Regions:
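Conserved glycine-rich cofactor-binding loop
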Residues: 12-13
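Conserved glycine-rich Rossmann-like NAD(P)H-binding loop of the short-chain dehydrogenase/reductase
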Residues: 26-41
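Substrate-binding pocket helix/loop in short-chain dehydrogenase/reductase
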Residues: 94-95, 99-107, 189, 200
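C-terminal substrate-recognition "lid" of short-chain dehydrogenase/reductases
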Residues: 115, 122, 130, 208-237, ...
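Active-site helix of classical SDR
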Residues: 118, 154, 162
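Alpha-helical segment proximal to the catalytic Tyr-Lys
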Residues: 123, 167-171, 228
Length: 243
């Protein structure tokens, strides 16, 4: 049986890196990053794990970059069976001061970019009558967060889009789900939580921030045959921050 191909965006660090490492050599792993150094990091990680795979540059806020990636993959006959939309950015500001580019950048990367990426790959999944699309959301989609109206709106949009896709694609054996992390120990949350770790932890019933591999384990489960009957869901992994 041929290996299934997994595409993970934002695979060089944090949750994306942990997701990559949660798979095994039964899969062909493709990771994306936004810089040459991140591509090298992904390739080094794939090699150290003794996986088969490759890495490519991708800026989800740049439509030409998305087109370049999909064209390159097609030329190499690489067709993702499992698409994991993990890459993301923050441009935090209260609405009163938020600039249009801060709003647009976050919506472009999280929502418009994912739409274009999914649209590029589902045709092959439909033809194969099998696929997995796993979108990384956030508790911000349901709780909101001061200074993150753009991020919360994008993540809520991703969850709504995923439910609609699950209805559209279910008859073709393509499952679409979201995983919504709470506060996880990553570079992105460090910017938010620096100096406030104890305060954040006090708001979480389990009393601590999560770890990237605790998100990755849920993602790899949703990508597996054990999750064949799960679609259209948002799985919250947040230590009880949102119930």
């Amino acid at each position: 049986m041929s290996k299934k191909t997994v595409l993970i965006t934002g695979a060089s660090r944090g949750i994306g890196k942990a997701i990559l490492e949660s798979f095994n050599d039964d899969y062909f792993i493709v990771g994306t990053g936004t810089s040459e150094s991140s591509i090298k990091s992904i390739l080094d990680n794939i090699k150290s794990l003794d996986f088969n795979g490759d890495a490519f540059k991708l800026d989800l806020g740049d439509r030409s970059s998305i087109k370049e990636l999909t064209t390159t993959l097609e030329s190499k006959q690489i067709y993702p069976d499992i698409l994991i939309n993990n890459a993301g950015i923050t441009r935090d500001n209260i609405m009163l001061r938020m600039q249009e580019d801060e709003w647009d950048n976050v919506i472009d990367v999280h929502l418009n970019g994912q739409y274009l990426l999914i649209k590029s790959f589902i045709k092959k999944m439909v033809k194969n009558r099998w696929g997995r699309i796993i979108n990384i959301s956030s508790t911000s989609a349901v709780l909101g967060n001061k200074g993150q109206a753009n991020y919360a709106a994008a993540k809520a949009g991703i969850e709504a889009m995923s439910r609609s896709l699950a209805r559209e694609l279910g008859s073709r054996n393509i499952n679409v789900n979201c995983v919504a992390p709470g506060f996880i120990e990553t570079d992105m949350t460090k910017e938010i939580s620096e100096g406030n770790e104890d305060l954040l932890a006090s708001q979480i019933p389990l009393g601590r921030l999560g770890k990237p591999d605790e998100i990755a384990e849920v993602v790899s489960f949703l990508a597996s045959d054990q999750a064949n009957y799960i679609t259209g869901q948002t799985i919250h992994v947040n230590g009880g921050l949102y119930m």
